A protein has these predicted regions:
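Short sequence/structural elements of tandem HEAT/ARM alpha-solenoid repeats
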Residues: 1, 8-9, 55-60, 145-152, ...
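Low-complexity, Ser/Thr/Pro/Gly-enriched N-terminal "stalk/linker" regions
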Residues: 1-37, 46, 56-62, 73-75
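A generic structured-segment signal
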Residues: 8, 12, 20, 30, ...
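An alpha-helical repeat/solenoid feature that recognizes helix-turn-helix modules
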Residues: 28-52, 77-144, 163-192, 213-240, ...
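Alpha-solenoid repeat scaffolds
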Residues: 51-54, 71-75, 143, 157, ...
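Preference for long, well-ordered alpha-helical segments
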Residues: 154-160, 164
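Non-catalytic carbohydrate-binding regions of carbohydrate-active enzymes
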Residues: 245-255
Length: 255
């Protein structure tokens, strides 16, 4: 299996840590660990390699992923925290910080809705946590510490989901999907709320999920894929599957 062999070749000296590629790595990309370890584990599982590992190796890999679970007052309790990811936001260069400041000023206008740096890093941590939890559950393991608070800014889940920019469903759909994962793996019992919300933004014409039509058809499709991954966790059917299939077939990928 060429793909699996390539992934194995990316493993670092520290076992269960992987490079994202062999060349062209950034300073942070070279040192990030959690996300790439999860992706490699998924690749092992999908190719059947995981089943052939010794139990001790499986448990050590799971322990490695769970070692990132910690407490930091800036993030929901028991989130999965990769220090390198956090530092990449904390130590942004002058130009990047200026961009966030300008975007925040522009967002004063109702016509724009850019994420602040704080919101951006919280979304990143949420995505990392979702990926770790879903990966572990997929292979029959679970997180050590229960995650009973999700990034919902102190309100109920419907309120939080409505604060997201659903003209950008790829990003917002990812947040929705993470809530689905947490609901079903952490016993949060959010299923009915999540089902009710997503039904309200299902689009009968495209089969996708958004409030305001996205700027590109690729965003329509990619957003739908994110939402569908969440619906799968909820064991909920896609609302307009035929429309979505037709839309995808009529919008060929840009090569």
């Amino acid at each position: 299996n060429f793909g699996l062999d390539y992934i194995k070749s990316l493993e670092k000296e520290e076992k269960y840590n992987f490079f994202p590629s062999k060349k062209g790595l950034t300073n942070y990309g070279e040192r990030l660990s959690l996300g790439f370890s999860c992706l490699a584990l998924k690749a092992f599982y999908m190719t059947g390699e995981w089943q052939d590992l010794k139990t001790i190796d499986k448990e050590k890999w799971v322990q490695h992923i769970n070692s990132f679970q910690g407490e930091d007052s800036k993030f929901p309790k028991n989130s999965y925290l990769d220090p390198v990811l956090i530092n990449s936001y904390s130590n942004l260069g002058y130009k990047e910080n200026i961009k966030y400041i300008l975007k925040r000023l522009i967002s004063i206008s109702p016509n724009f809705n850019y994420d602040s740096k704080n919101v951006a890093i919280n979304k990143a941590i949420n995505a990392e946590t979702k990926q770790a939890v879903s990966t572990l559950h997929e292979v029959g393991y679970k997180n050590n510490k229960e995650i009973n608070k999700v990034y919902s800014i102190g309100h109920d889940i419907s309120y939080y989901l409505n604060t997201l920019d659903w003209s950008k469903p790829w990003s917002s759909g990812a947040q929705f999907a993470s809530m689905c994962v947490f609901s079903e793996t952490q016993g949060l019992n959010l299923k009915s709320e999540l089902q009710s919300f997503i039904k309200t933004i299902s689009d009968k014409e495209t089969g996708s999920y958004f409030k305001e039509y996205p700027k590109s058809n690729r965003e329509v499709i990619n957003g739908a894929m994110k939402v569908i991954s969440g619906l799968d966790w909820l064991e909920t059917e896609i609302h307009h599957p035929k429309k979505l299939i037709d839309f995808c077939l009529n919008n060929k990928p840009i090569l």
